[in-house]
From Swiss-Prot:
Compartmental location: Cytoplasm
Sites where the protein binds Mg(2+): D703, E742, N746, D915
Compositionally biased spans, kind Polar residues: 593-608
Provenance organism: Xylella fastidiosa (strain 9a5c)
UniProt-recorded name of the protein: Phosphoribosylformylglycinamidine synthase
Family membership noted in the UniProt record: In the N-terminal section; belongs to the FGAMS family.
Binding site for ATP: G300, A301, S302, T303, G304, A305, G306, G307, E308, I309, R310, D311, A702, S917
Region spans: Disordered: 593-613
InterPro entries in the cross-refs: Class_I_gatase-like, FGAR-AT_N, FGAR-AT_PurM_N-like, PurL_large, PurL_linker, PurM-like_C_dom, PurM-like_C_sf, PurM-like_N_sf
GO cellular component: cytoplasm
Length: 1322
């Protein structure tokens, strides 16, 4: 056991912030320092190369004792767990030849002024560590106990009389009917259940997994109901089955897309190729991960995103996740530095993360998983809502909604799973088993706070997106084999772990299975059979393949370094047998490298009947499949509607318009969402056509997201979110209709072809066990399932429910309860024929125009439940939330609106579009003004007493910009669609930096543009200051609030229409480029495409191909090192990848030889840039290059930034000097750190960030990583090798940029970079 001391764990500003938090409780406490400490376990019988280990970890062996009066505390991963960092770093060190069994990293904190008071203070402990994921240890000796392995628990048998006790002990959440069912079945079997069987049954039959409430029969108000909830949802598909290829049958729904050609490597040769144009299809799925996010926000949200991504990948026989969405509903934020009068104090549940902590950590978790996996997150929503119903009852989201969804691509031949046959091999693909997420399916199905804290911890999960990336590469390879795809069927591993996934896999094919527990990969030898079978370790899939394909499948996994194990076989008898004593066919034998834990094999194909009773008695599981899936009791719910709500009504005549406008814009639901958007990569994959950010000033105001179906088409997919949950406190049916309506009005920003092509995912949340809430849920489902969606010809082929949305705890001698409203989040998806015809809220500057409001309420202007009401709910009395509830009164109105928008778009009448939602027309208009850096004169033609309802009602509708010259054509079209009474002019843009409310030429209220912007930006600014570098937050606010800021201002020094590579392409010669990737790299496809378009022949090269000698760099004229997260960037971005080269002599020599050849070139982008910078010692002319370290903001930065091409020797940038170009930026470690000032002066800089005036960008976020003089790209003395942090390969077409000048053609000027390389080769 070795303990090493590493570098400082906290930057100066984080250290100061940390100390300040501690001193609020113990003022005399000071932090002397905080350092990484590494705990390393050596493999038995081996010795470490300590000098290499010090070099790789940048650590030292000496761990000096603390100074006098200084106390050290160690914050380590929670005892008994393995951190994601450990898994990734262990693999990295194995690749570098280090014989370690395990490594963990913690933080040593040295404290001055520690006292007995501090040692026993819960507030201090809370600041030092998170008990859900960490342990606080007092000495190095205690630290060394981290790797202690306890004895595994034995298999338990549970007497039937003790089932109730077991139900409570393990938090199984079984109903009384289910316990009776189990007693009956086990009595029939003449035996008692094992603990493994009970846990498996509980997870497989939890509300989370089996949706018992949605499948229940109902009696409401003593009246039998005709339909179950699920039947009403399915009714929409029965009414409108068109364009849906798979519904309710798989991990995700599949809908028709436009024809497209896939671009991917040939699975045999690795050569990139354009495949034939085939009918398109894409899968859609939206999940929630509410309970884990409430307990541990970062890992909860991260694994929520990861689980949904796996659902897309595991659809049919293999899909490819393409783009994501996310969302959060929480209670009041209560930001300490931004108090709001409506955020009144109350007791909070001590067992759950606060709303503030959830929104500081949860979005980072969701974004981190998407970023590292390599999926752009293009859409989201955020709601903060809380109402006090009494002193002990709150309607809010203490148990949050954490939404994770998205869409993916799937080949039509792979939509339907194949049936497993007896003898087919059961595969576990992905990471090892650990004691993670045990019982999560059941835990998420009960009221938060009613289980024990130990069970809360047991359901906490951990993430490793880099592992999931490897799994996806295996899936992609299998899918690319087309009809030879070895995957017959598979499922992702989620709630319930293998105990749910493997039985589901077998049950789908009506087969049984024999599983050897010894074959399940595990990183924890102490796991009991229950823990091994039921844990929810993430990034795993279960697959069924033919035994004949096993060796070929193993080869794919080996190349991708993706762990897998053949754990069992399917059997004709529908019996599930799981244990350590089973025998499996010799055909399942694969090499030691793939299956480290092998049992003895025989040629006998196992069946339950051939196994002797004495052996079967020892099995953890020996059950007929129908015990799990057959005849469990069906729920019946007998309920009644609660009394009608009596929330006081807001008297808007008593409000001050000026202050009301500022309050509404400052509400977190309305306010700017930049702090949630820029942390997520939105350009990875190269298929983004509309992300959140719009315009030259890059504000996240897009109404929908759009992706492209392929690299050579403008057809694609659009998706949008609708959510109006607080209205359910007034009328749950109306809230559901409004959610659907809002999803449609958001989606209308895209060129939607037909309402019947729109498919919805419905995510339902409710506190179903609170009296009457289930009846309100029934009303909501009926409102859209039976009534609205069929009337619109829209179907709901996929969805999810989470029906334990309440928490309960004791405080001040009373029981407190927090219950969410009945909440529906609608995600709408549709194919689009031409993504270029999208509209955004960006107003056109050069056109005389007016803004028109199409208000679908027909003038009712209902204010019930509005943000205006919420921000004035600060009196001691009951909150003024009531009044008439907004609603979609007639589906025909929404149909007419949809048709109007399509016809107006087709006629070229619309310049801009923005839907009306939270904050009403006032907020929507302000957002359009903010996005466009324009002022507005807002007109109110009705009586002044109706001013507040006119401006702040949140009925369905949209605002469009129409040029004056098209006014008549637009109003004629409005009349044709019968919407004249719903349409009015509401504003016109001005160049003045002000927003005015005008009535009969009288100014009723006026704000400066910056005053309103400051209110709108306040939440983002406050959250960034708490979460990121506060200096960066201040700098961004100052730039964003400047009305005269120039924004993105591109200029070109060359004609991009001139293709310098064309003469060489015409020769028919295509030089070969290695598209190089390491495990965790995710940007290789778009990189290959850009080189291919420039005239190169591209080949997919994994580092394993070079290590094994399958290929050699001599075979390639060029090398492109791609972006991503090699080894999860655990030791610094790109360092793991570089280490895998530097620590292998033969590989190091091969790269050195390639770099030395003057007829070879190399390009490193992002992670490839970081990796090549670490190899500068072997690259001629690169000796002055910097290292790339953490961004100054200490946050992942995803931006569209403005670059200037500097005159340099770079062959890639020849003829481009002086150009100023927008480009996608997405990295966490892009700060260029030079060894000396002389190196910075001598380095050949090729690219730098600039501001809109053409000057080197020194302020954030124009310089997103803080590099000196904006440096972000460098080259060698001869220019053959260039490295850059931004991503030109993601934006070869103007459709890929979030904004570009109107005069640019189909391609962006960045294609010149790749064409220059082809011209250089000649």
């Amino acid at each position: 056991m070795i303990v090493l001391k590493g570098a400082s764990a906290l930057s100066p500003f984080r250290l100061a912030r940390f100390e300040s938090r501690l001193q609020t409780t113990v003022p005399e406490l000071h932090i002397v320092g905080a350092w990484h400490c590494y705990l390393i376990q050596i493999k038995s019988g081996h010795t470490l190369d300590m000098s290499a280990l010090h070099r790789i970890l940048q650590a030292e062996s000496v761990s000096e004792p603390p100074q006098e009066h200084v106390v050290s505390r160690y914050v380590m991963p929670r005892l008994g767990t393995h951190s994601p960092w450990s898994s990734k770093t262990t693999e990295l060190l194995h690749g570098a030849g280090q014989p370690i069994a395990r490594i963990e990293r913690g933080t040593r904190i040295d404290l001055l002024g520690w006292s007995a008071n501090a040692a026993t203070c819960p507030a201090i402990a809370k600041q030092l560590y998170d008990p859900m994921t960490q342990s606080l240890l007092e000495s190095e000796d205690e630290v060394k106990t981290l790797f202690n392995v306890p004895e595994p628990l034995s298999l338990e048998r549970i007497a039937l009389i003790d089932l109730e006790h077991a139900n409570t002990r393990w938090g199984l959440a079984l109903t009384a009917d289910e316990i009776d069912y189990l007693r009956t079945r086990y009595t029939e079997l003449n035996r008692v259940p094992s603990d493994v069987e009970l846990m498996m049954f509980a997870q497989a039959n939890s509300e989370h997994c089996r949706h018992k409430i949605f499948n229940a029969t109902w009696t409401i108000n003593d009246k039998e109901q005709q339909h179950s909830l699920f039947q009403m949802i399915k009714h929409t598909h029965q009414h409108t089955p068109q364009y849906t290829l798979s519904a309710y049958a798989d991990n995700a729904a599949v809908i028709e897309g436009h024809p497209t050609a896939r671009y991917r490597p040939d699975p045999i040769t690795g050569e990139y190729r354009h495949e034939a144009v085939l009918p398109g299809a894409f899968q859609i799925k939206v999940e929630t991960h509410n309970h884990p996010t409430a307990i541990a926000p970062f890992p909860g949200a991260s694994t929520g995103a990861g689980g949904e991504i796996r659902d897309e990948g595991a659809t049919g026989r293999g899909g490819k996740p393409k783009a994501g969405l996310s969302g959060f509903s929480v209670s009041h934020l209560r930001i300490p530095t931004l108090p709001h009068p409506w955020e009144t104090p109350r007791a909070l549940n001590p067992r759950m993360a606060s709303a503030l902590d959830i929104m500081l950590e949860g979005p980072l978790g969701s974004a981190a998983f998407n970023n590292e996996f390599g999926r752009p997150n293009l859409l989201g929503y955020f709601r903060s809502f809380e109402l006090s119903a009494s002193k002990t009852l709150t309607r809010a989201y203490d148990k949050p909604i954490m939404l994770a969804g998205g869409l993916g691509a799937i080949d039509r031949i792979h939509i339907k799973k194949l049936r497993l046959q007896p003898g087919d091999v059961i595969i576990v693909l992905g990471g090892p088993a650990m004691l993670i997420g045990l019982g999560g399916g059941a835990a998420s199905s009960v009221t938060s706070g009613t289980s024990t804290e130990a069970l809360d911890f047991a359901s906490v999960q951990r993430d490793n997106p880099e592992m999931q990336r490897r799994c996806q590469e295996v899936i992609d390879h299998c899918v690319a084999l087309g009809t030879n795809n070895p995957i017959r069927s598979f499922h992702d591993v989620g709630a319930g772990g293998l105990s749910n996934a493997i039985p589901e896999l077998l049950h789908d094919s009506e087969v049984g299975g024999v599983i050897d527990l010894a074959k399940i990969p595990s990183d924890d030898p102490s796991l009991s059979p229950l823990e091994l079978w039921c844990n929810e370790s993430q990034e795993r899939y279960v697959l069924g393949i033919s035994a004949a394909h096993l060796q070929a499948f193993a080869a794919i996994c080996t190349r991708e370094r993706c762990p897998f194990a053949a754990v069992g076989v399917a059997t004709a008898t529908e019996q599930l047998i799981v244990g350590y004593g089973v025998t499996l066919p010799a055909a399942l034998h694969v090499t030691e490298q793939q299956t480290p834990q092998r049992a003895n094999h025989t040629e006998t194909s196992p069946t339950p009947n051939t196994l002797p009773p004495s052996v079967r008695e020892a099995f953890a599981i020996d059950l007929p499949m129908d015990v799990l899936f057959g005849k469990a009791p069906k729920m019946h719910r007998n309920t009644a509607h609660p009394p009608p709500p009596h929330w006081p009504t807001l008297d808007s005549t008593q409000l001050d318009l000026h202050h009301a406008g500022l309050r509404v814009l400052a509400h977190p639901t309305v306010a700017a969402k930049n702090f949630l958007v820029t942390i997520g990569d939105r350009s990875i994959g190269g298929l983004t056509a509309r992300e959140q950010m719009i315009g030259p000033w890059q504000l996240p105001l897009a109404d929908c997201a759009i992706t492209l179906a392929g690299f050579g088409t403008y057809a694609g997919e659009a998706f949008a979110i609708g959510e109006r949950a607080p209205l359910a406190l007034l009328n749950s049916a109306a809230a559901a209709r409004m959610a659907v309506g809002e999803a449609i009005t958001n989606l209308c920003a895209a060129p939607v072809e037909s309402l019947s092509m729109v498919k919805l995912s419905a995510n339902w949340m409710a506190a179903a066990e609170h009296p009457g809430e289930d009846a309100l849920l029934y009303d909501a489902v009926k409102a859209i399932g039976i009534e609205l969606c069929p009337a619109l010809d829209i179907s709901i082929p996929v969805g999810k429910d989470s029906l334990s949305m309440q928490s309960r705890w004791q405080a001040d001698g009373a029981t407190h309860t927090c219950i969410s409203p009945v909440s529906l989040v609608i995600s709408a998806f549709t194919p689009v024929a031409d993504a270029r015809r999208q509209l955004t809220p960006l107003l056109h500057h050069q056109t005389n125009s007016e803004l028109w409001l199409i208000a679908l309420d027909g003038g009712k202007q209902r204010l019930g439940g509005s943000v205006l009401a919420q921000v004035h709910a600060d009196s001691a009395a009951l909150p003024t939330f009531g009044g008439e509830c907004p609603d979609l009164d007639t589906p025909e109105t929404l149909r007419a609106f949809f048709a109007l928008m399509n016809d107006a778009r087709n006629a070229g009448l619309l310049l801009a579009y923005h839907d009306r939602s939270d904050g009403g027309a006032f907020a929507a208009l302000c957002e359009m003004a903010f996005a466009s850096h324009l002022g507005l004169d807002i007109t109110c033609d009705n009586r002044t007493e109706h001013l507040f309802p006119h401006l702040f009602n949140e009925e369905l509708g949209a605002i469009v910009q129409v040029a004056d010259e098209h006014r008549t054509a637009f109003t004629d079209l409005v009349e044709q669609h019968g919407l004249t009474a719903y349409t009015q002019r509401i504003a016109h843009p001005t160049t003045a930096p002000s927003i005015r409310i005008m009535h009969n030429d009288q100014c009723l209220a006026q704000w400066t543009w910056e005053t309103l912007f400051d209110a709108w930006w306040s939440v983002t600014h406050a959250m960034q200051r708490l979460r990121d570098n506060p200096e960066c937050a201040d700098e961004e606010r100052e730039i964003a609030r400047t009305f005269t800021a120039p924004g993105l201002k591109p200029t070109l020094s060359f004609d991009p229409a001139v293709d310098v590579a064309m003469p060489f392409i015409a020769t028919g010669i295509r030089p070969t480029v290695a598209i190089l990737r390491e495990q965790g790299i995710n940007g290789h496809i778009e990189m290959a495409l850009c080189f291919e378009r420039a005239g190169f022949h591209c080949v997919d090269i994994h580092m394993n191909d070079l290590i094994t000698g399958r290929v050699h760099l001599d075979e390639f004229v060029g090398l492109a090192a791609c972006g991503g997260f090699s080894y999860g960037d655990v030791l610094g971005a790109g360092r793991g990848w570089a280490t895998s080269i530097l620590e292998r002599t033969a590989l190091r020599d091969q790269f050195a030889a390639f770099f030395t050849r003057t007829d070879r070139f190399a390009l490193g982008v992002c992670n490839g840039c970081q990796m090549l910078s670490q190899l500068k010692s072997m690259i001629p002319g690169a000796e002055h290059w910097p290292r790339f370290v953490r961004n100054r903001s200490e946050q992942f930065e995803a931006r569209t930034a403005l670059l200037e091409v500097i005159q340099s020797p770079s062959i890639f940038l020849s003829g481009m000097a002086g150009s100023r170009l927008p480009v996608a930026v997405a990295h966490g470690e892009g700060y260029a750190m030079f060894d000396t000032p002389a190196d910075q002066a001598a380095a050949h800089v090729a690219l730098r960030y600039i501001n809109g005036h053409g000057q080197a960008a020194t302020h954030y976020p124009l310089n997103p990583n803080g590099s000196p003089n904006g440096i972000t790209g460098l080259t060698t003395t001869d220019g053959r090798i260039t490295i850059l942090m931004p991503h030109p390969e993601r934006t070869p077409r103007t459709i890929n940029l979030s904004w570009s000048p109107n005069e640019w053609g189909e391609d962006t000027p960045w294609l010149r970079l790749f064409r220059n390389a082809r011209a250089w080769v000649g």
